[in-house]
Amino acid sequence: MHTKTIFTMLTVASAATALTACADPTTTTNPASSTTTTTASSATSYDISSIPTVDDIAALVPDDVKMRGTLRNGASTGYAPAEYMDADGQTPIGYDIDINKALAQVMGLKTGETKHSEFPTIIPALGTKFDVGISSFTITTEREQQVNMVSYLNVGSAWGVATGNPKNFNPSDPCGTTIAVQTGTAQEEYAATLSDECVAAGKGKITVMPHELQTDIATKLIGGQYDATLADSTVIGYTSTQSGGKIEQIGETFESAPQGIAIAKDDAQLTEAVQKAMQYLMDNGYLTDILATYGADNAALTTAELNPSVN
């Protein structure tokens, strides 16, 4: 993990760069009980049938993946609009799911298959259970030491509250509040860092409530159990829409950080194939079109960098 700056608690905005820090996927704080699971309503997936196979890229695909014919993706499917379950509760949908299918199409494979996996378990399963991890992974130096990361999105972070802000949450001073986050995300570590700053300043600590699924947070936030939630800006916007306006963003979006596709560190061949397939999707407008289906096209990057330098 790269060195993080210790921030003053006068303004949250000044601490935004902490969100590039990787959360320790083995650590949780005050785990929340997730007894109610909400499922986002069905969305129209992007039709990948018009995306061609690119022979030069298909030639790079490792033989075992070619033989299988499937690009296996692990994703924590409770983080709409990136990855979540359809109304049937069984079918993964979202822009990351469509991106995996599009990559498979470019690489000449039969399909891209996504299976749900709890967020902290995805990276350890790369190279065995999964070929790729496309699940809103913020690119960090720690993750780049563990796996190869191919950049494709730039996503900020934002606070969300019940509409009207009935708890009077102040994003510039969240001390003494109860904040919901998804387990293993950059936002979980950021909230814990803010809590430490609060205590150091003689203020009340932040009670951080991690959930395995981001979708579990909405009901409890609306019901008044939490003061606020902290998540990717795309997630807050989508959650607001899906809640019928019962959740809203408060404050500005924090500084954006790149997200990447994770591939096993020792699989240079698959890494090259994924990087070039992603660049093809970018160059030909497919990535933007996929994201636009979910209202997230502003997050698209134009260069698929391998293990980019991050602060």
Q: What are the residue ranges of the model-derived segments?
A:
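Bilobed "Venus flytrap"/periplasmic-binding protein-like clamshell domains
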Residues: P92-V106, F137-I139, G156-L213, A228, ...
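C-terminal motif of bacterial Sec signal peptides marking the signal peptidase cleavage site
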Residues: A18-A21
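Acidic, polar ligand-binding/catalytic clefts
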Residues: G112-D173
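Extracytoplasmic small-molecule ligand-binding "clamshell" domains
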Residues: A40-G133
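A ligand-binding cleft/hinge motif common to bilobed small-molecule-binding domains
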Residues: F137-E144, A192-T193, G223-S256
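Ligand-binding clefts/hinges and TM-proximal coupling segments of bilobed small-molecule sensing domains
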Residues: T44-D63, E189-V208, Q279-N311
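Bacterial signal peptide processing site
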Residues: A23-T26
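Periplasmic-binding protein-like
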Residues: T77, L153-V161, G237, T241-Q279, ...
